[in-house]
Amino acid sequence: MSAKTAPPQAALLRSALPRPPLPRNVKILAAVSFLTDVASEITYPLLPLFLSTVLGVSAAGLGLIEGFAESASSLMRLPAGWWSDRTRRRKPLVVLGYTIAALARPLIGVAQSAGQVLLIRVSDRFGKGIRTAPRDALIADSVAADQRGYAFGIHRASDNLGAVLGPLIAWGVLTLGLAELRTLFLWTALPGILSVLLLVFFVRETHGPAATEQRLASAAMPKSETDANGPPLAVLDVASAVPLGAPFWRLLAVIFLFSLSLSTDAFLLLRASQLGVSNALIPILWAALHVVKASSSAVGGGLSDRVGRRPLILGGWGIYALVYLGFAAASAPWHAWALFLVYGLYFGMSEGPEKALVADLAPPSRRGAAFGWFNAAVGIAALPASILFGVVWDRWGAETAFTMGAAIAGVSSVLFALVVPVPAARAVREGQV
């Protein structure tokens, strides 16, 4: 057997074996995301209704609030990721971010103006910005390279299962008259606090497979690059130690362009209402979307470990473009139901593989910073994406706005296929092929 044929045969052998169980960190972080999304998705599908009917906010105003909220989170994503690399401590930032969101989110229940909702949403997303990159880096650190897609897929599936249960709780509470809207928002403090307790008591800084990669890389460094006690300077000053590389930056540029099509999903809920879906069924529609997201996320992430990230991401982005074209042409309530279900496949096929590809392209010592840049790019794009979509909707109609989003997604898909490389060299080093 030649050296050239050994790696592919080894990959085939690994793919035929049962998957090893995921480590506790991944499972607990998945549970935390489940609880957080239960709380978040009780609120989110009802927020457009609350803003438009209770506070009288227009489509452009909705886009402004959600755009600022998502972009505000980007202010902390990069420095949080960088700091978690610098200190090699992910958990404190993850706990802080989830705590801020858990405390801020219920306050929507006492908001009396659009400005107050904006402040609350910005605080909520600011917490998300603090936690996201360190959490993703912690997941990547906790598993071997050939389990990354699966780990991120399971994490996204748990997140989406929470997003199924949250709207169902909201629908049940409101339908049965157990509480009015503002009281329901206040109740979201309960799952938020429970998620923080899980983090504090059960998640540990990792010393797993990816940490071993970093120790091996550090051991290979010249003695002149270590301090008197032995730790490599790369661990202490990762920002200047290892470049992220051109392939990573090309991926980031294309993801930023695609993210300009990612206006807030609140517009999809408004479009569904416009097409005739009743307010009582909006939470059920939102839950149905997340059933598809949850079931497809675990499959999509794991499949990307076997067939590669590129086919899954391209397929997901293509579905996104087609769904937006569908919303532009839709004219009946059942169109909204069908499009929401197909829309769930986009998330399942692309979210986990995108994050796994970021981890593939980033050196182990820079994963926190890499996820910081990735999440910052998506967050920064959210503001112009949502504001532009809302303005186009108000001036030229929903059909034009959705067509614009589909066009941006289509162009981004073509660019992804042309300029984003398959990370073959690093995949071989980490045992992926």
Each predicted region: which residue ranges?
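C-terminal membrane-cytosol helix-exit motif in multi-pass small-molecule transporters
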Residues: 190-214, 412-420
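Helix-to-loop junctions at the C-terminal end of transmembrane segments
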Residues: 76-88, 174, 296-309, 393-394
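Helix-loop junctions at membrane interfaces in 12-TM secondary transporters
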Residues: 107-120, 328-339
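Juxtamembrane intracellular "pre-TM" segments in multi-pass secondary transporters
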Residues: 2-23, 205-255, 433
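Transmembrane alpha-helix termini and helix-breaking/packing motifs in multi-pass membrane transporters
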Residues: 49-54, 165-185, 384-400
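Intracellular juxtamembrane helix-capping segments at the cytosolic ends
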Residues: 130-143, 349-362
